[in-house]
Amino acid sequence: MTAATIQRNKPSGFRISKKVLPYVLSLPALLVCIGILIPFFTSVVYSFQRYRLSQPWARQFNWGDNYISFFTDPRFWNTLEISLLYAGITVLLELLLGLGIAILLQKRSTLNNFISIMLLMPLMTAPALAALMWKLMTNPGFGVLSYLASLIGLQDFRWASSPSTALFTVVLVDIWVYTPFIMILLLAGLRSLPTQPFEAAALDGVPRSFVFFRITLPMLTPYILTATLFRLLDSIQQFDIIYAMTQGGPGDTLTVFQVEAYLNFFQSTNVGRSAALMIILWAITYFLSNIFIKNWLRLRERARGLA
């Protein structure tokens, strides 16, 4: 018995001090932060330089000239307008559709669970691949959607190749890909709501519309804000779907921030201007994040009070 006890209490060959262990465990997070901060600060430095890949020997600081030039450039304001318009339309429509689908699938059942899993299939598709698939389906010559459009009288519907319909087409693809993301978040929120308020409302004979707008919606608001924030930040930085389908065209119809930065970098080889665009985009997303997070914290406390 003594020998066994001694053997069991024998210290292992490798032990980490309790003082060192927290630093070891935080090392992966530190590496991630370094991987984020180095490119960010490099972009900040480049944004204050006149730097072209075609003329690397002429690289020099021009301080704020890249930023100042945007205020007098109509193309920049067009990019800002298109980016905000695209983000606003896609997020609003995806939120409405996602909420509607989540309400329909709220009841726990084998069929509803199966349908929710099937609806996640577009989300598992790479956005660029989804865009190429839709580009084939909307091809005027052999696309299945073009054929269906012709059956209802829309002959030669140009989808993404016309300035008047390009935004509609790309928004349609974005909705198909990302609505399941909002749906699954709101479905999880609906199924996690406490049942007591709804049971009390049912006993009192409260109308369903009143229950939805006065009980369900306020309690679900933190989840709605979370889904909106994630999608808004992602949508305002959209690149894959837009570039794969239209390359930012026709003309400058869909030159959102990421596409404009890409064109500045790879076509114009203007690294400084491209970096400045990305820093402005970061500032916009940071501003929007702060607004949403503050409102999310406030509404979460209100939802807890309702529960």
Regions found by a protein language model. Give the residues of each.
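Short, Lys/Arg-rich, polar N-terminal cytosolic tail immediately upstream
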Residues: 1-17
